[in-house]
Amino acid sequence: MYNKMVECKNVVYQYKNEDESKNTTAVNDVTLEVNEGEFLVILGRNGSGKSTLAKHLNALLVPTDGKVIVEGLDTSNEEDVWTIRSKTGMVFQNPDNQIVATIVEEDVAFGPENLGVKPSEIRERVDNALKSVGMYEYRKHEPHLLSGGQKQRVAIAGVLAMHPKCIVFDESTAMLDPKGREEVVNTIMDLNKNSHITIILITHYMEEAINADRIVVMDKGKVIKSGVPREVFKDVKTMKEIGLDVPQMTELAYELKKEGINVKDDILTIDEMVNELCRLK
């Protein structure tokens, strides 16, 4: 039996248009559970509501209707907001917007200091967080001299130092080059596998979703699909219809099947494709 980390119950979020003539519904009746220790990916094209939903998971936004519960605490209860944010950290798209100090270790210490953690414990938390993301040797560096991937790992360390049980990554690799993206994705997977932190990854990079425990697909504010990566991605037709890609090898399998070549339709990686083609010899 899994413990529930996050529960979204019929969540609706509306905001006024610029002319204030009517409301726009960004999240429309979303019900979703995230289990403790799970690696969940939320996919959707721009405007699908995925980032708006993400901001509900640590009470940056509260629902217009419905409820979001984080480890039993209702995000609409103002008295619980700081507790919720200490349980559920968030890493945003642009690391420059999340880094507040001029030295790496001072930046990582900022969160625990604001939580009132004792100085001796802050030192330990900062060192452990930087080691967890492979940035300990850069602790005395100035953040602006780091690469994009390194900055994002410092931002992750800043969240880790607050000892969250869950981290939401809101398109945190979108502004990175391929090397930086790989660094951050490897860090995310390591935190989930070895530190057992619940991960909620919002992305539009399909390759990042392959290793998830579960994928949720959003379109027009609604959850339209949910399942393990193989289940979700093999439905290439539906994914294309809503403007999303699938992993390259899944698409290749789809095209081969259309040409009458009998390969599996749930292939995700190059190795799987090679093995499948060798089987057909």
UniProtKB/Swiss-Prot annotation:
Broad class of the protein's primary localization: membrane
KW Membrane (keyword) present: yes
Disulfide bonds: none
InterPro entries assigned to the protein according to its UniProt record, in alphabetical order: AAA+_ATPase, ABC_transporter-like_ATP-bd, ABC_transporter-like_CS, ABC_transpr_CbiO/EcfA_su, ECF_ABC_transporter_ATP-bd, EcfA_1, P-loop_NTPase
Keyword tags: ATP-binding, Cell membrane, Membrane, Nucleotide-binding, Translocase, Transport
Pfam family membership, one: ABC_tran
GO terms, molecular function: ATP binding; ATP hydrolysis activity; ATPase-coupled transmembrane transporter activity
Membrane topology of the entry: Peripheral membrane protein
Residues binding ATP: G44, R45, N46, G47, S48, G49, K50, S51
Keyword Metal-binding attributed: no
EC number(s) given by UniProt: 7.-.-.-
Subcellular location: Cell membrane
One Gene Ontology CC term in the entry: ATP-binding cassette (ABC) transporter complex
Top enzyme class: translocase
Superkingdom assignment: Bacteria
SMART domains, per the entry: AAA (SM00382)
Residue ranges of every copy of the ABC transporter domain listed in the record: 6-245
Job of this protein: ATP-binding (A) component of a common energy-coupling factor (ECF) ABC-transporter complex. Unlike classic ABC transporters this ECF transporter provides the energy necessary to transport a number of different substrates.
Assembly description: Forms a stable energy-coupling factor (ECF) transporter complex composed of 2 membrane-embedded substrate-binding proteins (S component), 2 ATP-binding proteins (A component) and 2 transmembrane proteins (T component).
Similarity comment: family membership: Belongs to the ABC transporter superfamily. Energy-coupling factor EcfA family.
Descriptive protein name: Energy-coupling factor transporter ATP-binding protein EcfA1
Organism: Clostridium acetobutylicum (strain ATCC 824 / DSM 792 / JCM 1419 / IAM 19013 / LMG 5710 / NBRC 13948 / NRRL B-527 / VKM B-1787 / 2291 / W)
Taxon lineage: Bacteria, Bacillati, Bacillota, Clostridia, Eubacteriales
